[in-house]
Design a protein with these regions (language model features):
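Cofactor-/ligand-binding subdomain signature composed of acidic, glycine-rich
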Residues: 1-32, 200, 250-264, 575
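Cofactor-binding active-site loop characterized by glycine-rich and histidine/acidic residues
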Residues: 21-22, 39-160, 290, 295, ...
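Non-catalytic terminal/interface segments that mediate subunit docking, oligomerization
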Residues: 244, 248-347, 353-363, 466
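Peripheral docking tails and interdomain loops at the edges
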Residues: 268, 376-378, 397-398, 525-578
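A glycine-rich helix N-cap at a beta->alpha junction
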Residues: 84-94, 159-171, 359-371
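Active-site nucleophile and cofactor-binding loops and adjacent substrate-binding regions
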Residues: 37-46, 66-70, 98-117, 140-144, ...
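Glycine-rich ThDP/TPP pyrophosphate-binding loop and its adjacent helix/strand module
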Residues: 106-265, 269, 273-274, 278, ...
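Glycine/charged-rich beta-loop-alpha catalytic/anionic-binding loops adjacent to active sites
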Residues: 27-34, 95-109, 132-137, 305-317, ...
Length: 578
């Protein structure tokens, strides 16, 4: 049935056929995610509501914005993308998130939490001003409903004088279980129909509708039609209680573990997050001032043990990255030593607070930045390739990049007594242990991983930041040594400050910089400027990502395609040394 499905015909389906359609959606989503990886549990829980949306509304004339996008797989399958769904999250394939360039059914690109209500308001005002006739819908989970941007948008609802439908898909989870006072209000309504809480929501200018079982198709069809009818008179909040992982027993029992699922058979590398969790627990055992803050991602960031062992010093503030940054700054002002663990792509949401609250006050906050660099299959909205650039411009902030998981341990030890803002950034997986000098970390001090003994008129040094770039450097070194050529490899573990002693002392005539970051404002440009100001006369060649948003795909392939191409770098090194 799903293979031949057409949105135009769904209104002719019987209830029995619609239930079969729901079953087929779940099977297709499960099979595809097992093969390609992706977000499983959230999508399994949103099947009935999505079928009801297609049955009641008229897409693509009506517009829907999926907040984050973790619930959009059923929508993609019902909007003409079944045949290509097997390419989910692959290079050139179907995106795991809504994408306007992919289909006319996708009204607005998403990937980060809290944007859907604002986006729906904007589309609704465009409709009103152009005199168009269409419904505009924001589909948002209870985890995202904690985000402050949602309440900025709700505060604008009456001012903008427009009509939207907000579907609140309440499964009690973001990645982790949903936390916070706002969720307590939502949960009171779900559990007991608390009238005072309903009035609070309606004070924004919304008519409230509740659905006890959002995975009951009959109930969803009726509620969706009622919401559509009410929408003619003003904005509506349709609150549906669903089960994350619905229809797959293991996922229902383990919603956090099946939130994001790798392809079956994927190699299991040790993750930096595991080392972060172990390291922070060890530090906290010795230092009672150490605290940890997470924005709704404690499991993914390796913090479960810390939250278990030190609950009084562990704080999950929900999807509220700005609040988390100010909380850390003020904890530091009160004499604590806060660590804020967060994905690179989400840290950029708190840019102002990093400047204004943490760094301008020179607070000893440590940012533990996971998924830095190209993240791969989640595409443009999740690549962590900007942090070196936007953090490098901030005074008082030190930026460190460990070469491997063991150096992350050493950097955490260093951070415990560091009295200034510090950012430590690293990718997801740690595959290699490089060895090295095994000395205590010193601010701004780099490390030779290999020092050439060759004497020649031309001497080259590769300055590489982080594990991925050092892997490339060491691979090229091996190939060059097999051809009788040699060069220095430097673990540039501090991006800010640079190792000015190295820059002063090096006898290299050619410098190559490698970074898992965009070129603009990044490590390479800083190195080029430093050598120019030192009047060294070196030729500096930068390898970083060009000025484009990087789509989904494999990490190594994307590195090569967008500016850190191992073959190209090797050819340049050989041309210098030959």
């Amino acid at each position: 049935m799903l293979e031949k499905f057409s949105p135009e015909n769904i209104k002719n389906y019987t209830k029995s056929q619609l239930n079969v359609l729901c079953d087929e959606l779940r099977v297709t989503i499960y099979d595809t995610v097992m093969r390609c990886g992706g977000h499983l549990a959230s999508n399994l829980g949103s099947v009935e509501s999505t079928v009801a949306l297609f049955y009641v509304f008229d897409f693509p004339n009506d517009k829907i914005i999926f907040d984050v996008g973790h619930q959009c797989y059923p929508y993609k399958l019902l909007s003409g993308r079944y045949a290509r769904f097997g390419t989910l999250r692959q290079a050139g394939g179907i995106s795991g998130f809504p994408k306007r360039t992919e289909s006319e059914y996708d009204a607005y690109d998403t990937g980060h939490a809290g944007t859907s209500v604002s986006a729906a308001l904007g589309l609704a005002k465009a409709r009103d001003l152009k005199g168009e006739n269409r419904n505009v819908i924001a589909y948002i989970g209870d985890g995202s409903f904690n985000n402050g941007l949602v309440y900025e948008a709700l505060s604008s609802l009456k001012i903008l004088n427009t009509k939207i439908l907000i579907i609140l898909n309440d499964n009690g989870m973001s990645i982790s279980p949903t936390v916070g006072g706002m969720y307590d209000i939502i949960n009171q309504i779900k559990e007991s129909g608390a009238s005072e809480s309903i009035r609070l929501l309606e004070s924004f200018g919304l008519t409230y509708l509740g659905v006890k079982n959002g995975n009951d198709l009959e109930e969803m069809l009726s509620a969706m039609q009622e919401a559509k009818d009410l929408l003619q008179n003003g904005s509506v909040l349709l609150h549906i209680a669903t089960k994350k992982g619905k229809g797959y027993e293991f996922s229902e029992d383990h919603p956090t573990g099946t939130h994001g699922v790798p392809p079956v058979g994927s190699p299991k590398d040790k993750e930096y997050s595991e080392v972060l969790g172990e390291g922070l627990c060890a530090l906290a055992k010795e230092d009672k001032s150490i605290t940890v803050v997470s924005a709704a991602m404690k499991e993914a960031l390796g913090l479960s043990d810390f939250f278990r062992d030190y609950p009084e010093r562990a704080f999950d503030v929900g999807i509220c990255e700005e609040n988390a940054s100010v909380l850390c700054a003020s904890m530091a002002a009160g004499g604590l030593k806060p660590y804020y663990a967060i994905y690179s792509t989400f840290l950029q949401r708190a840019f102002d607070e990093i400047i204004h609250d943490v760094c301008a006050q020179d607070m000893p906050v440590t940012f533990c930045i996971d998924r830095a660099g190209i993240s791969g299959a989640d595409g443009e909205t999740h690549q962590g390739v900007f942090d070196l650039s936007y953090l490098s411009l901030i005074p008082n902030l030190t930026i460190a990049v460990p070469k491997d998981t063991e150096e992350l341990r050493a950097m955490l030890t260093f951070s415990a007594t560091y009295a200034h803002p510090l950012a430590i950034r690293y990718p997801r997986a740690g595959r290699v242990l490089f060895g090295g000098e095994n000395k205590p970390i010193k601010v701004g001090e780099w490390e030779y991983l290999h020092k050439s003994a060759k004497k020649s008129a031309k001497k080259l040094a590769v300055l590489a930041t982080g594990e991925r770039c050092l892997i490339i450097a060491m691979k090229i070194l091996k190939n060059m040594q097999e051809q009788g050529l040699d060069f220095d490899v430097i673990n540039a573990r501090f991006v800010k400050p640079l190792d000015m002693q190295f820059i002063k002392d090096t006898d290299a005539t050619h410098i190559v910089t490698l970074e898992d970051n965009v070129a603009n404002g990044g490590f390479g440009q800083a190195v080029s400027m430093a050598f120019m100001q030192a009047n060294k006369g070196c030729i500096v060649k930068n390898y970083a990502y060009r000025d484009e948003f990087i789509p989904q795909g494999g990490v190594a392939a994307l590195q090569c395609e967008y500016g850190v191409n191992c073959k190209e770098i090797e050819e340049y090194v050989k041309s210098v040394l030959s």
